[in-house]
UniProtKB/Swiss-Prot annotation:
Keywords: Activator, Coiled coil, Nucleus, Transcription, Transcription regulation. Component of the Mediator complex. It comes from the Eukaryota. Component of the Mediator complex, a coactivator involved in the regulated transcription of nearly all RNA polymerase II-dependent genes. Mediator functions as a bridge to convey information from gene-specific regulatory proteins to the basal RNA polymerase II transcription machinery. Mediator is recruited to promoters by direct interactions with regulatory proteins and serves as a scaffold for the assembly of a functional preinitiation complex with RNA polymerase II and the general transcription factors. GO terms for molecular function: transcription coregulator activity. Residues 136-179 form a coiled coil. This is Mediator of RNA polymerase II transcription subunit 30.
Amino acid sequence: MSTPPLSGPGMGAAAGPGGFPGAQAATAAREVNTASLCRIGQETVQDIVFRTMEIFQLLRNMQLPNGVTYHTVTYQDRLGKLQEHLRQLSILFRKLRLVYDKCNENCAGLDPVPIEQLIPYVEEEYSKHDDRGIASQLRFASEEKREILEVNKKLKQKNQQLKQIMDQLRNLIWDINSMLAMRN
C-alpha cells in the first residue's frame, strides 16, 4: 500500500527515490492534474490509516512494566519499529499537506459551481419546446382537481346521509328492544 512519490515545483526533489531525473521530472510535474492529486491524496490517507493501525497493534502487543523482567533486545526491537512507523507517519502527513496545498492552488482560480448545476437533469420530451403542451397540461390538471373536489363533496354528502340512516335504524332497534323488554 504505497503511493508514488510526488514531484514538482515546491513538492520535493526532482531526483529522489522513485522520482524522475532532469527533464522528465518537469514533464511529469505538468502531467499531474487535480484529479490525480486527489487520487494520490486518497491513497496517502489510506496509508496513514494503515500505519496508524500498525502503531496501535504494536502498542497493544507491548508489555506493561509491571515488575516483570523485560528483555532489552525485544524492547529495543519494538521501540525501533514504533519509531520507524511514527517517522513514516510523519512523512505521510507532510505528503498529504503538500497534496492538499497543491490541490487548493490548482483550484484557486475556479469559480465555485452550485451543486444543483452538477446534477444532470433529464427533461421529458414533450415539455422541452412545447409551451402549449404545458398550458394544456395545466388546464387538464386544474380540471382533474376540480372533478376530484366535486367527487369529494358528493362523497361527504352521501356519508352524511348514510350516517343519518344508521342513526335512525339504531334508534328504531333501540325502541323495538325497549318494547320487547317491557312486554316480558
